[in-house]
Amino acid sequence: MTEITAEGNASTTTTVIDNKNGCIPKSPGKVLKRSVTEDIVTTFSSPAAWLLVIALIITWSAVAIVMFDLVDYKNFSASSIAKIGSDPLKLVNDAVEETTDWIYGFFSLLSDIISSEGDEDDEDADEDIDKGEIEEPPLKRKEIHQEKAEKEEKPEKKIQTKASHREREKGKEKLKGEKPEKTATHKEKLEKKERPETKMMAKEDKKIKTKEKTEEKAKKEMKVGKQEKVKPTAAKAKETPKTPPKARKKDDKEMPAVHEQKDQYAFCRYMIDMFVHGDLKPGQSPVMPPPSLTPSKPALSTTALEEKEKEEKKKMEKKDTSDTKKKEKEVKKKSEETTIDGKGKEPGKPPETKQMTAKLTTQAAARKDEKKEESKKMRKPTEEQPKGKKQEKKEKHIEPAKTPKKEHPGPSEKLKKAKAEQAKEEIAAASTKKALHGKKEEKAKTVEQEVKKEKSGKSSSDLKDKEVKKEKSGKSSSDLKDKEPQLKNEEKSKPQVKKEAKLASSDKGQTRKQNITRPEQVIPHVKPEKAEHQEKGHPSIKKDKPKPSSKGAPEVPDSGKKKIEKSEKESKVPTREENLQVYNVTKAEKPGKIPKDSKEAPASKKDKEDSKEAPTSKKDKEDSKDVPHSKKDKEVTDDVSSPKKQTRPISFFQCVYLNGYNGYGFQFPVTPVQQPGENPGKTNSPGQKQQEQ
């Protein structure tokens, strides 16, 4: 009985030992795998899970169709509509087949997953069975664990004993070597002090180098902007930025502690500096971030450089403007000399202008030959003096009219040289054309002066005949009464003559300005002929209707009243109409109207006949005594500018001057109010357009 109890106790002890040693339990993975399969079975047993699965299949299939464009929507919609109209059952069957295919595929995937999990479970169970057969009894395991623990404790003790021996030896060495270590520590401290100093010097050198590099890059950018400037300014720009680094070195020596404190923000300051100078591109990364003094100082230096550049630019612009002004003055002097010389040869003449000048000279020579004999007999020095003065005044008008064309230097520095060359060429071309205009005007003036001299000679011959008759006849008291209204008429006519002379000079200035501004455009060869015809138009104004000068003397005293009324009407006429008439004649007069000069000879013959037929009354004698020759000339010009000239018919194109032309013209001339900035020649009237074409 005792043996049985012992065996029973032994068996009980073995079971306890087995439990304490934990004979290898099955892995938790197996339990999880079993639970997953159980969960799948439980979930799919409910119908809600199946509904969710179907919904997911539909949604993700739709996503796949949209993402990968698996369906042609147009064909699909058209075919589906046709199929629904024809065979709705076929559509339903096709849809069912497609859905069943999807469902079968999904179930096949699930079955594969589940079957693979079942295979893994079987393999794990087989491995556990094999391990259970090989396992050792638990008593042997206990012994093995105890032996391993003892082996681990022994090497730890050995390591501790070795460490204690080493510590003792180190303690002895410390006691012996305390004094020499102190000296070594002093040396090490000195070396450490020297090393940070060298480091600081190296840092300062790096800072200086980086600053110099940034300055050089800034200089290069400046040079790219200053390529078109003159060399001295570039030299100044090179000298100026070299000064700041010395001051910066001093600041670096004075402020080393500040750098050490603010090294945290060095990289930020470096990036800001690089973006300010424009060196760093978005793809690059800074290799050496040098700490600058403060973020404000480089910006200040750049602003100072920009201010210096602006000052230098201003100086250079002033120099350029002064040089261009000097050149323009020299060109003006040359052009004036050419106009004074007048008849010198000029290379820029086109052949047609030469032909027209030759025609003018031949016409003038023919007129001179016909009328030299009459004019030589009747010339007097008193008549020649005021005419010379008139010539000088007209030449003075010509010269300032030529000067106003100036080429102002443009603000952009890039185009200065090109503009200067263009200005020289344009001024040379303009000077040649101005000289041509000056020559033509002088020739026209000489023709006018000869006609005036002839008229004055005729009047002087009439005066001589009258003086001979005066000596024979006596003076009467009634003549004195008639003198007074005539003298008043003459006094009134003097300011009118002056006003008309001023108006004529201003009109000529306007026409010359227009002629000067036009050479910039491309001028066809036909236009110089028109210009000469226009200049011929001036004498035709003054030569029209010279008859009233000779007929005015023998008239009854009523003629004096008529003259007074005419002068009053003239004074009331606004100056704008006179300007318009002169302007219209010069611009819009056609070459068909010009040959009025050819009628001068018969007009002069009529003057002679009128002077012979006129009765020699006492009034005429007294007038010829008291009135000087210059007043007679003024009366002639008054008669020429009488309102009879204004009553002549005006062509349609001279009448219409509208700002916005609407296709209908007025019977009377309408002048737009000219603004001071506008050129009077640039009116958009249809008449001018047709004439220019």
Swiss-Prot record:
Cytoplasmic topological domain: 1-47
Biased composition (Polar residues): 354-364, 672-693
One GO term (biological process): establishment of localization in cell
GO molecular function: signaling receptor binding
Keywords assigned: Disulfide bond, Glycoprotein, Membrane, Phosphoprotein, Sarcoplasmic reticulum, Transmembrane, Transmembrane helix
Residue numbers spanned by region Disordered: 117-260, 278-649, 666-693
Residues that span the membrane, as ranges: 48-68
Lumenal side: 69-693
Residue ranges with Acidic residues bias: 117-130
Bilayer topology term: Single-pass type II membrane protein
Segments forming a coiled coil: none
InterPro entries the record matches: Asp-B-hydro/Triadin_dom, Triadin
Top-level taxon in the UniProt lineage: Eukaryota
Name of the protein: Triadin
